[in-house]
Amino acid sequence: MSAEIVLAVDGGNSKTDLALVGADGSLLALARGAQSSPHHLGVDGCLLVLERLLDEAVAEAGLARRNGRVAQVAKLMLAGVDFPAEEVALAERVRAEGWAAETSVANDTFAVLRAGTERGWGVAVVCGAGINCVGVAPDGRHARFPALGAITGDWGGGYDVGLAALSSAARSEDGRGPRTTLEGAVPHHFGLRTPTELAEAIHRRRIDVRRVVELAPLVFSEAEDDAVASEIVARLAAEIVALARAALIRLDLHQGPVEVLLGDRKSTRLNSSHRLRSRMPSSA
């Protein structure tokens, strides 16, 4: 049975999808769980999440595991696997688990590129909890970014957008910045009245600061009528374009037509508002 099955994983910083797929493309089982980024959970924590999801998928598909093996091929696309050495190390651990006869590991940005184009090349930008980009040329050359946050020049993931909203709300309240509807909307999201109350709750660890990622959709909603929220969205658009443009130039793909793919709802909403299309190179 394993010779006919592909184990596919799309693991992000907020959720993980694990699928068992037949050789004909039929979906045998799909399990969804928590984040599986080895950067945040460690390799052991990552494997624990995947093992649980695999057990669910195997049960759903009505399969039997023989010596741990489920599939002929395992393709794992995971956030937090940002360097080739990390891909190699995680792939070795997965092979040791014996889930499949053949195993490959890559960053989850490659999943967007593979899902969005049949050509197998182009540029993909993912804007989830963090932000990342990958470019692949027709000859197989890659353009990648470390995507480690501020230390590698990144801005624009859900955490950054949420933190910008929180900061703007606080500055609106105390007069240092322009007035914005975020002043009320941001604390209200957490059941509080003012940005100061929210800041104190975060400071005293009653609210985990990582929850600011929840504010990203709110920023888009407020941006329809609020100048400050709109500026945050515009900055995100500029960062996405900067990533895509850099990948295109590094691969010398800026002369002819190239598919540029956007992953996650935030970047998709940006594209639908034409903020991105007007800023992209003419080749994109």
Regions found by a protein language model. Name each.
Residues 1-66, 70-71, 95, 115-121, ...:
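ATP-binding/phosphotransfer module of carbohydrate and carboxylate kinases, centering on a glycine-rich
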Residues 22, 78-82, 109, 274:
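Short glycine-rich, polar/acidic loop-and-turn segments at beta strand-coil junctions
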Residues 45-49, 80-85:
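Alpha-helical substrate-recognition element adjacent to the catalytic core
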Residues 69-77, 107-112:
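Short, glycine/charge-rich beta-strand/loop segments that flank catalytic centers
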Residues 73, 102-104, 259:
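Proline-centered loop/turn at the N-terminus of a beta-strand
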Residues 75-81, 127-129, 258-267:
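Glycine-rich beta-strand-to-loop/alpha-helix junction loops that act as flexible
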Residues 81-179:
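Phosphate-binding/catalytic loop of phosphoryl-transfer enzymes
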Residues 275-279:
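Basic polycationic patches enriched in arginine
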